[in-house]
Amino acid sequence: MDFSLFPRAADLRDRVRAFVTDEIEPIEAAAHTRITRLRESGGDSWTPDPVIKGLQAKAREQGLWNLFLPAAHAGTYAADFGTDGGEGLSNVDYAPVAEAMGRSFLAPLVFNSNAPDTGNMEVLLKYGTDEQR
């Protein structure tokens, strides 16, 4: 089997690597500290972190959002709840992109590619009603 990446997948992998290096890794320690302090103080660690929300917006702007979804996924719900995007990558092409995300514990969250959300989105996209999508 040929595991060569298509140029589009190689480009996405390289862009994800650069984003992780330039944007995510520099804030990891501070984010970990904030999360730890919230948990230790009994605070709600599920409250969206404004720094992470900012990085998510940047990732979306750069076309690095929901890379696991089929191409051209869109709609009212998708726009409202941030599930739009998608590149239609094969598993072979997505694997190195996911590997690049794996360099940071925050990256899957920033790129909206974290489990179990990815699987849930794929199931709803394929089998859900228009409202669920």
Labelled PLM ranges:
Residues 1-112:
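Amphipathic, small/basic residue-rich leader segments at the start of a protein or domain
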Residues 111-130:
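N-terminal glycine-rich flavin-associated loop
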